[in-house]
Amino acid sequence: MSDSRLVDPFGRRITYLRLSVTDRCDFRCTYCMSEDMQFLPRDQVLSLEELYAVADAFIGLGVRRIRITGGEPLVRKGITGLLARLGQRAELEDLAITTNGSQLRERAAELKAAGVRRLNVSLDSLQRERFAAFTRSDRLEQVLDGIQAAREAGFERIKLNCVVQKGRNDDEILDLVEYALANQLDISFIEEMPLGSITSHRRELTLCTSDEVRAIIERRWPLTPSLARSGGPSRYYQIGDEPSRIGFISPHSNNFCGDCNRVRVTAEGKLVLCLGHEGALDLRELLRSHPGDRERLSAALVAALNLKPERHHFDAQEQVQVLRFMSMTGG
């Protein structure tokens, strides 16, 4: 049993923090942000010291896993120093990063040295033109080189995250699994979440459910349920005795809220209790009004958990329910 003091009204203990360190990104993925995205003024983004104060308070309350997100976290100046401070915290069982992979070729080794244990790398296509269309950036080879650099650096696990969309990349599902198997990587296939208003595609038409993805994979390989858990919402399967795990994140077709053990803090200091709800608590105001007051911050976090909803209600057929883009929330 976790000793976390962060307990919501439904008895779920929060042991996992997803901490966004920037809303900025060197890609413009079509499902994550609009092409003309306006980033936050820098003074509205938490400083590195404020980010550490937030993480420190959560650790003190029983959080044992932290994932650093963005935007693209590796474009944040000074991020390695923050990671090194967190990497020294003996209480943490896991320190991970979600990245687009664009910076990994040069920085994988320093991330490993800082104490990062696991990487998630977004990869929606292995085809150059299609990758460029998804990301609005022609840097597929740079990302693939970065993944290889991360393998050489020796992370505990590296996982690919793929958002599958009908008519856009669902014909690459088997190719992506083959790439993961060949490189001993995990891969999670994700149903697109309806966050932020976009014009590049109609989500209700491109939604590809996890069951559909799984059926495609099982035409070639039988999938066996895995006992492995990552602390996140993925349901994992394995192919024979391959070390790679095949995961499915299914916010639409298989609601995973019952086991929710996580909260998010955005780059501007908003505590997001549920990905599918607009409500958030402003931690930045508290941090700047009472700098260094860990007790006050901790009390606010404990109290905020009373507002955590039981579940989200994502519906691909309805209008956008959350106007906040994924790049603002932290992936």
Curated annotation (Swiss-Prot):
Keywords: 4Fe-4S, GTP-binding, Iron, Iron-sulfur, Lyase, Metal-binding, Molybdenum cofactor biosynthesis, Nucleotide-binding, S-adenosyl-L-methionine
Binding site for S-adenosyl-L-methionine: 31, 71, 122, 193
The keyword Metal-binding belongs to this UniProt entry's keyword annotation: yes
Cross-referenced Gene3D superfamilies: Aldolase class I
Binding site for [4Fe-4S] cluster 2: 257, 260, 274
Any one GO molecular function term: GTP 3',8'-cyclase activity
Catalyzed reactions: GTP + AH2 + S-adenosyl-L-methionine = (8S)-3',8-cyclo-7,8-dihydroguanosine 5'-triphosphate + 5'-deoxyadenosine + L-methionine + A + H(+)
GO BP, sorted A to Z: Mo-molybdopterin cofactor biosynthetic process
Domain Radical SAM core: 9-234
Pfam families assigned: Fer4_12, Mob_synth_C, Radical_SAM
Principal EC category: lyase
EC number: 4.1.99.22
Binding site for GTP: 18, 67, 98, 159, 262-264
Top-level taxon of origin: Bacteria
Pathway(s) the chain acts in: Cofactor biosynthesis; molybdopterin biosynthesis
SMART domains given in the database record: Elp3
Entry binding sites for [4Fe-4S] cluster 1: 25, 29, 32
Cofactor annotation comment: Binds 2 [4Fe-4S] clusters. Binds 1 [4Fe-4S] cluster coordinated with 3 cysteines and an exchangeable S-adenosyl-L-methionine and 1 [4Fe-4S] cluster coordinated with 3 cysteines and the GTP-derived substrate.
Listed InterPro entries: Aldolase_TIM, Elp3/MiaA/NifB-like_rSAM, MoaA, MoaA_NifB_PqqE_Fe-S-bd_CS, MoaA_twitch, MoCo_biosynth_MoaA/MoaC, rSAM
Cofactor(s) this protein requires: [4Fe-4S] cluster
Binding partners and assembly: Monomer and homodimer.
Entry's family note: Belongs to the radical SAM superfamily. MoaA family.
Annotated function: Catalyzes the cyclization of GTP to (8S)-3',8-cyclo-7,8-dihydroguanosine 5'-triphosphate.
Protein name per the record: GTP 3',8-cyclase 2
Organism: Pseudomonas aeruginosa (strain ATCC 15692 / DSM 22644 / CIP 104116 / JCM 14847 / LMG 12228 / 1C / PRS 101 / PAO1)
Gene that this polypeptide is encoded by: moaA2
